[in-house]
Amino acid sequence: HYRNVDRHDVMTDPHILSMRIDESLYFANAAYLEDTVFAQAALREDLAHVILMCPAVNAIDLSALEALEEINTRLRENDIALHLSEVKGPVMDALERSDFLNHLSGEIFLSHHHAVMALRTRETADPALI
């Protein structure tokens, strides 16, 4: 299980930032999402991956899609990949109708655990073996 690092004594990975989104994404919270992702990313010198965990996101509007595009672009400019996990069907449908997935620097994972395990494996892999 993945827990709030401010409330629980948990292990973290310096290369991975996991953020859980607890509501639908729309114009009223899109800028807050951007600001929060960038603020947290700035605190991690060795960051390579940001995973937005989306099990509570039931809907997404155009403003939020634009925010995700901006997050993806700015992270990519800093060699950080953006990934999504646990995306619900209707939200995935909206992402597929947009151009966002064509530019996503990372991947979409069915489960958050799978995302973390896959990305940790990549970060710890011996470059000589790849």
List the predicted regions and their residue ranges.
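Structured cytosolic domains appended to multi-pass membrane proteins
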Residues: 2-130
